[in-house]
Amino acid sequence: MTKFLLPLLALICFGVNAQVQKEIFESFKLQERRGVSYYFPEDYTEDKKYPLILVLDADYLFDLVVANAKFYSEHNRMPQAVVVGIHQSENDIRWEDCDYEQTTGLPTEKAKLFYEFLGTELIPYLETNYNIAPFKMFIGYDITANFGNYFLFKDTSLFNSYLTISPVLATEMESRVPSRLLDLDQEIFYNLILEKEKTDGRQQILQMDNAIKSITKDNIHYFFDQYDEPDHISIAAYGISKAFDNVFKLFRPISPKEYKEKILKSEEPVFKYLEDKYARIEDLLGFEKAVELNDVMAIYAGSAKKEDYESLKELAKLCKKFYPETMMGFYFEGEYLELLGEPKKAMKAFEKAYQMEEIDFLTKDLAIEKIDALKADFGY
């Protein structure tokens, strides 16, 4: 039994630049060795924080989740994330790990231990040894999808987001999940994926869906997607990308539609939209996101179109912080001062911009044009 006294030390160390690694984790709670797969972004760094995606049924789902996470992060549609998968196919142990009492719907004794393994051993180990952000996502399928719901019943949910794929719901879960979501004050994303094929538990799932849909709290974000083609097996391959879209929509760069409908039509200062967007990202994910060039240009265009000069001033300050080597900050400052009727100060700002790196449409030639125009107009 002594081999279980230091369960975490049995996790073999590896370089995080190795993108995917499977290791054996010795669990004190389970008194078992469990196969765990890890994915770290190729450019993982101690300077950033990464959301954690926990995947049960890793033998089937881990590669699918990693592929989607890589694709979405590479196209800037979600942050880079650490993905951890628990292997449960050997001896069909997934049913033991996630089983529940038929009469009460509560986890069996073995399932309680598995719950403790995840919540008090594996995740704390990752949080201690790697730069894990506060935002955590749970992904499960069938019986393992139902198991994720038990994490909702803590005073504070361990996970901020749940992807529940065609769940085998425990007794009374169709009422317990909506009731718990209604009571929670923290922000929760709950994605339910279902096939249209008739299954034994389909009506129970639809009852839960209807109950959750009736919740009108701002902190609960519920998404239900039902697919025509897949059956109960193939449904596991559906919905992961849709769930990432639902959860990380805010993380995406400002789109042309967003620009037209939310920035140009808003009565508030243009810069406030950018400020609120990035503050919301930080609140949700637990880390500051560097402001995207696309978003800078959207706010610049909106400020010009709406003649919102104060937003241009704030944008200049922001660019000096996030793009300090480029000419953006001083160029935008120069335009602001020019519009404010401060030609001497504007010219100095453009001169500083000229000495810095070009970016996007901002070139040294453009800065010279501004300087020459001011000299011609005011005789400097």
Model-identified regions with their sequence ranges:
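A domain-start/cap signature at the N-terminus of enzymes
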Residues: V16-P51
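Residue-level recognition of tetratricopeptide repeat
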Residues: A301, E335-E338, E369, A373
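Alpha/beta-hydrolase fold nucleophile elbow
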Residues: Y130-D142, Y162
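The feature captures the conserved acid-bearing segment of alpha/beta-hydrolase catalytic domains
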Residues: A170-D231
